[in-house]
Amino acid sequence: MTRLAVLLGAGALLAGCRGGEPRLEFTPARVVSQDTENGATPMFLATPRGERVVGWISAPDGGADGSLHLSVTPAGAAGPRPVVTLRDPLGPIEAHGEAPPQLAADSSGGISVLYAVGREIPGQRWPVSALRFTRSTDGGRSWSPPVTVNDGTEFGAHNFHALTAAPDGSLLATWLDAREGRSGVWMSRSRDGGRTWTQNRPIYTDPTCPCCRTAVAVDAHGAIFVAWRAVLPGDVRDVVVTRSADGGSSWSPPVRARADGWVYPGCPHAGPSLKVDAHGVLHIGWWTGKDGEAGVYYARSDDGGRSFAALPIAVGKQARPAHVQLALDADSGVVVAWDDGLSEMPRVLLRRSADGGRSFGPAAELSEPGVAASYPVVAVYGDSLAVAWSQTTAAEHREKLADRADMKDPKAVMQLPRVGQSEILLRAAAR
């Protein structure tokens, strides 16, 4: 039986640590998914009101019939409210590590979720999906009936999504969509709390890596930034960023966060993470597989995404795909969490910058030795940060890799992701 553990950690950030890096202290893990049979694809959100939202997906017998579970801890509360379980009438909620449900908090206090409902079609090699949205206005106690965000054919190649809330209270969703015959980056916006969504509009229809997640961020003035992995001439698969100053009507030419020049005839399932701080500085983290320069990078832009200054975070000659997540704090701190592709087994590591991303402290290993840990997520709340990730044994990790469908085989069929026999654990630090 596969045991896929998901751990959540919180550690105190040292105040006023301009000259040093924060020390993270973790308490022993405790199970937070005891109300469900299993759990996968952890999500974490810290809202402006101080709520902490933890989410995960479970499925009977560790299969693909996914339900979404959300646990909300109000600001100042000793513990969370009862877990709320969401089912979708269209079908199972996908437990996809590279395309998990996305959480966002808006200025009116709403908590929103964007997720994919998957469906296997007999005779087709790939599952299809629909992007679905739901929102809570009472702190996560109840949730609105789900609506479909993508237009056109409800089920299709709509996935690898991102969600954010703009300063004006509107919600922005981006995703990869192949409705025009090949994968591109698309967007929709809601100005009524997610009840209705605008006509879907393409951001980028040139070749796009079809299985790497998108990322979206909005600055204080309403400028929208979107990042993804483009397929450039020569099969170069580098991460790019574009900007819109008119609400998404037009977009700047995409700019590479770094000229990695990674040539690869496939998709690594490893998209970027993108944030913008209160000063308008853009922060991005990603992975590249270029031989001799492979690994995790971070870059910042002080000119609205026109240019970037990049730093290596964890780089070697070769590296397996890593999944990077960023978080920002109010004191110019930048946190980078990733699953290390340089070691024999993936492990979750974290580095923090106290000077806005100009330099980073040493890496801290958060997962246990001797296991395979992947798909971290990270958030900052108050003077603490939280990191969640998926974990399994080394033997189970190797077995999963061996059972993976080889989609280069024209007869191979990809199934919906399975949850596995997993659980969600919590680690919290004294503040």
Predicted features by range, described:
Residues 5-15:
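Bacterial N-terminal signal peptides
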Residues 4-5, 411:
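Generic extreme N-terminus detector
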